Amino acid sequence: MTLDLSKPATAGYLSGFANEFATEALPGALPHGRNSPQRAPYGLYAEQLSGTAFTAPRGHNRRSWLYRIRPAAVHRPFEPFTGPQRLVSEFGDSADVPPTPPNQLRWDPLPMPVEPTDFVEGLVTMAGNGSAAAMNGCAIHLYAANRSMQDRFFYSADGELLIVPQQGRLFIATEFGRLDVEPFEIAVIPRGVRFSVALPDGDARGYICENFGALLRLPDLGPIGSNGLANPRDFLTPQAAYEDREGAFELVAKLNGRLWRADIGHSPFDVVAWHGNYAPYKYDLRLFNTIGSISFDHPDPSIFLVLQSQSDTPGVDAIDFVIFPPRWLAAEDTFRPPWFHRNVASEFMGLVHGAYDAKAEGFVPGGASLHNCMSGHGPDADTFEKASASDTTKPHKVDATMAFMFETRTLIRPTRYALDTAQLQPDYFECWQGIRKHFNPEQP
């Protein structure tokens, strides 16, 4: 049996966010009533994968038990990866991380590679903060690839990977089963989980937030109530599926921002059954239940929060993943686009599809922008003039769009690559220079 990534998956998914799942690809493969029997069914090995400390409170404790053909320890020693090394995980001053300018920054899309390039080879770090070694902060990567991973498997020991495809579907095989992910969906691969990516559409491009800190979770809803935003039932986790395949394969590991490779003589997708609450998942952003004002004013963008990584300060997240999906705007006597803003947090934005309602030009699908702590930003001149003159007695639908934001409590530091790349737009600041003075002290 193999996980055939040449065609779409046929198996269904398990529904729910961080549930205690139990799934088996062969009947009776899950031990009954215990985790580590003296002899596991079918001659399998029992292995625990821990995503949190053993002593984490039960409501926050994340782990899974895997029943596999060979333990994860079975591979040759690691050595430095000889392919592209464009990843950064430490965001203090260094050759890879120059001083962070206070300028507003914006980039054109990462170009598709000319040479054959798989998902691992196509990764490049644009920005980040904190430290993978200290397990705090994040790294923001882009990927651009044009071939499937062939007999190569990958995992990150540095953090969980929040993957946002912008172009091209991803068929992702993992130790836990398979995820098929398309633009408008996201996938989260937990720290340490081995996976491989096939590209059924050829070219693929997208964004990744690698979370070094506390695991992503659904936000509390407060006075919104018991439903709304991203609903737990819409998060999908793979059912167990395995392959028993031997050969000359390569295992690539990311540790402290560096890539390492090891020879492995079998496929690590040999998990026949598993149970637990630490597993990959995907979510369709089109299912997000958008909340907004039906009287006046534009609420804070926290109403668009999909997932959060909490910090040690109550109410202050280390990372927020926010989206700006299609939605109705109905507020009267209100400037409806996102307002002008300076933020104590830092904001890295991307665009999956369409146009962002605060920027009429220049911010295109696959592109990105960075507005760091206290850098002024907001709608461009054309957007401001149009929105200031629009008829707000009638509702308006923002349609055919999907923008998102990685917002962090600490400064997002662009890498040397991000500041030197030809995709950096040198004239981004010009979008605000046409904003006119309207002040008239004689006319309130």
UniProtKB/Swiss-Prot annotation:
List the GO biological process terms. L-phenylalanine catabolic process; tyrosine catabolic process
Q: InterPro entries from the entry?
A: HgmA_C (IPR046451), HgmA_N (IPR046452), Homogentis_dOase (IPR005708), Homogentis_dOase_bac (IPR022950), RmlC-like_jellyroll (IPR014710), RmlC_Cupin_sf (IPR011051)
Q: What class of enzyme is it?
A: oxidoreductase
Question: What does UniProt list as catalytic?
Answer: 298 (proton acceptor)
- List of residues binding Fe cation: 341, 347, 377
Please provide the record's keywords in A-Z order. Dioxygenase, Iron, Metal-binding, Oxidoreductase, Phenylalanine catabolism, Tyrosine catabolism
Q: Which reaction does it catalyse?
A: homogentisate + O2 = 4-maleylacetoacetate + H(+)
Which family does the record assign? Belongs to the homogentisate dioxygenase family.
The role this protein plays is: Involved in the catabolism of homogentisate (2,5-dihydroxyphenylacetate or 2,5-OH-PhAc), a central intermediate in the degradation of phenylalanine and tyrosine. Catalyzes the oxidative ring cleavage of the aromatic ring of homogentisate to yield maleylacetoacetate.
Q: What is this protein called?
A: Homogentisate 1,2-dioxygenase
Gene name, per UniProt, is hmgA
